[in-house]
UniProtKB/Swiss-Prot annotation:
Catalyses which reaction(s): (2S)-lactyl-2-diphospho-5'-guanosine + 7,8-didemethyl-8-hydroxy-5-deazariboflavin = oxidized coenzyme F420-0 + GMP + H(+)
InterPro entries the record matches: CofD, CofD-like_dom_sf, FbiA/CofD
Cofactors demanded by this protein: Mg(2+)
Disulfide-bonded cysteines: none
EC number annotated for this UniProt entry: 2.7.8.28
Gene Ontology biological-process annotations: F420-0 metabolic process
Protein name in UniProt: 2-phospho-L-lactate transferase
Binding-site positions, 7,8-didemethyl-8-hydroxy-5-deazariboflavin: 49
Keyword Nuclease: no
């Protein structure tokens, strides 16, 4: 079994390539929940949903979020009633959020809810929230602290930030299922997701770093030069006082990583790194990258 640590954009592209080489049942994905948010009566787990929709064959791969071909009737009406609405959520996607919220209110864990949703959509891959406890990512601005979703979706990252914080300010416990997925893995792959808001929250869960220290870990940088392939990783890395490039990512992951992969076009020099084509513009490129990664096992 191969276990991935994933956020919601870069790593799912790699997972798309992995599916062409491995049975879904041989893949486990530990997913960031630091960006989860209660919103308009639903509970959104954006990264969990992206991974789940991918394996269900439902993901809109034009945007890498939401359901392919979804309608937006509810969103259109809500915009007239609640003009401050800043998330464009499709109707089928919203139904998942509402169901998740109802189950959580009834006392189900996020892990159990995710299992139930995966069963409903016929997903055989093991998709695991990093924790059943809240660990929400906020950013600090001149006007106060705001949820990461508001920073990235409402403001498109166009506001200065001076800190990245988490609520509550204590390590969340990794679930037993997460620990088990790491222990059973032949290799753990840290995908090319945002290092600060997608991967660090997973690494912050109690027990995760200790388990990874016993495993072979391969990490893929999301940077090419001084910019990430997508998302606000550059500004977030600078806020964390790390270089906004692959050298910063390597330093952030420190001694957890056995093999560090960066793009063949990357101008940043990381000693000992493996150079591959990591710009996954097509499923074929993602599959080729995954094939190259598997040769490093």
């Amino acid at each position: 079994m191969i276990t991935f640590l994933s956020g919601g954009t870069g790593t799912p592209k790699l997972l798309e390539g992995a599916r062409n080489m491995l049975p879904d049942s041989d893949i486990s994905v530990i997913v960031n929940t630091g960006e989860d948010i209660w919103y308009q009566g639903g509970h959104i787990s954006p990264d969990v949903d992206t991974v789940m929709y991918l394996f269900a064959g439902l993901l809109n791969t034009d945007t890498w979020w939401g359901v392919r071909g979804d309608s937006f009737l509810t969103h259109d009406v809500l915009k007239t009633l609640l003009p401050a609405s800043y998330m464009s959520i499709g109707d089928k996607d919203r139904a998942v959020h509402i169901a998740r919220a109802e189950w959580l209110k009834k006392g189900m864990t996020l892990t159990r809810v995710t299992q139930q949703l995966c069963s409903h959509f016929g997903v055989s891959t093991t998709i695991l929230p990093m924790s059943d406890s809240p660990y929400t990512t906020y950013v600090r601005t001149a006007k106060g602290d705001i949820h990461f979703q508001e920073y990235w979706v409402r403001y498109r990252g166009n506001t200065d930030i001076c800190a990245v914080l988490h609520v509550p300010d204590e390590q969340p416990p990794a679930t037993p299922e997460v620990i088990d997925a790491i222990r059973k893995a032949e290799v753990v792959i840290i995908g090319p997701s945002n290092p600060v808001t997608s991967i660090l929250p997973i690494l912050s869960c109690t027990g995760v770093r200790e388990e990874l220290a016993q495993k072979k870990v391969i990490a893929i940088s999301p940077f090419i030069g001084e910019g990430p392939v997508s998302g606000p990783a550059a500004q977030l890395m600078k806020t964390m006082k790390y270089p906004a490039d692959s050298t910063g990512v390597r330093a952030l992951y420190a001694d957890l990583v056995d093999v560090f992969i960066q793009d063949e076009r990357d101008t940043a020099q990381v000693p000992g790194s493996v150079r591959l084509d990591t710009l996954m513009k097509t499923p074929a490129i993602a599959e080729r990258l995954m094939r190259e990664i598997l040769t490093r096992l």
